[in-house]
Amino acid sequence: MSLTINKMLNIKGRTCLITGACGKVGQALSLALSEMGCNLILLDHPKTNLKELKNQISKKFKNEIILIPCDLESSREIDEVNLSIEKNFNSLDILINNAAFVGSSNLKGWATSLENQSLDTWRRAIEVNLTASFKLIQNTKKFLEKSSHASIINIGSIYGIYGPDLSIYENTNMNNPAAYSVSKAGLLQLTRWMSTVLAPKIRVNSISPGGIFRNQPEEFVKRYIHKTPLKRMGSESDVVGAAVYLSTDLSSWVTGQNIIVDGGWGVW
């Protein structure tokens, strides 16, 4: 007999690891998965305030929350993530690779003209946005294989698919770093590669959001909306909707796919 929608949506008691948990999207994902009854392993850079996020969630929900301060540029620190999983849960149902340097990250030689983009920052972005996801999947595979509902979700970007239209950035302090696009494109291919290698025990999919509204300059927002059929920028909730779908049994026969959440940006 087929499952009901409520049963397919039920992920209460499952364990989810979210990287970049303190970012805007990471916080929204953490709250949403908590609301659905998941136990959480929240990972972010040691300089972020993971404890504050835990307190915020604990005021609303009673699930178990483990915090892992981790510099994703450090292979040694990534290896230590397994120790926390083993100690606290010894299994994993959902891995969301969300951490990344993004276009607005405050990095030297990052969101600037091509001529001024730094090779050192390029390497750092590849390390955090792509290599760390590979390493985490590699390390957590043994825990995910214990689950009968294992799902990996990689957070990509429309700029892993499309080239940028630099005209929307004119006369703003914004730009589109090459390393961001390239690292996200690599993450999408990693998704496809892992989906066949880890099948049938583990599903692997990605979500590619378009631009999310973050109080960008008014002129940029107007230009962005003009190019978007649904006539608005995205929100964290738009990403959460796709992530919930991929976390639950609603998507139990979906793997190797990239869900583009961009308000129609790419269909012109």
Report each predicted region and the residues it spans.
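Short C-terminal tail/terminal secondary-structure segment
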Residues: 2-7, 164-167, 171, 244, ...
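Conserved NAD(P)H cofactor-binding loop of Rossmann-fold oxidoreductase domains
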Residues: 98-110, 264
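Conserved glycine-rich cofactor-binding loop
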Residues: 22-24
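Short, small/polar-rich loop/turn modules that mediate ligand/substrate recognition or access, typified
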Residues: 149, 199-203, 254-256
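Catalytic loop of short-chain dehydrogenase/reductase
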Residues: 115, 119-121, 145, 153-199, ...
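Active-site Tyr-X3-Lys motif and surrounding loop/helix of classical short-chain dehydrogenase/reductase
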Residues: 80-87, 106-127, 223
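Conserved glycine-rich Rossmann-like NAD(P)H-binding loop of the short-chain dehydrogenase/reductase
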Residues: 38-52
